[in-house]
Amino acid sequence: VFCRFNGQQCTSDGQCCYGKCRTAFMGKICM
């Protein structure tokens, strides 16, 4: 499995390298 960096869109399970998956105006991104 790979994780998403901050500023990238979250995967369906919301796995982020750092921070958390949050809903933004452009969809769900890692912050």
From Swiss-Prot:
Entry keyword set: Disulfide bond, Knottin, Neurotoxin, Secreted, Toxin
Major site of localization recorded for this protein: secreted
CC annotations in GO: extracellular region
Ranges annotated as spanning the membrane: none
GO molecular function list: toxin activity
Location of this chain's protein in the cell: Secreted
Tissues where the protein occurs: Expressed by the venom gland.
Bridged cysteine pairs (disulfide): C3-C17, C10-C21, C16-C30
Pfam families reported in the protein's UniProt record: Toxin_29
Function: Acts as a neurotoxin.
Family: Belongs to the neurotoxin 17 (21C2) family.
Domain notes: The presence of a 'disulfide through disulfide knot' structurally defines this protein as a knottin.
Protein name (record): U13-ctenitoxin-Pn1b
Protein species of origin: Phoneutria nigriventer
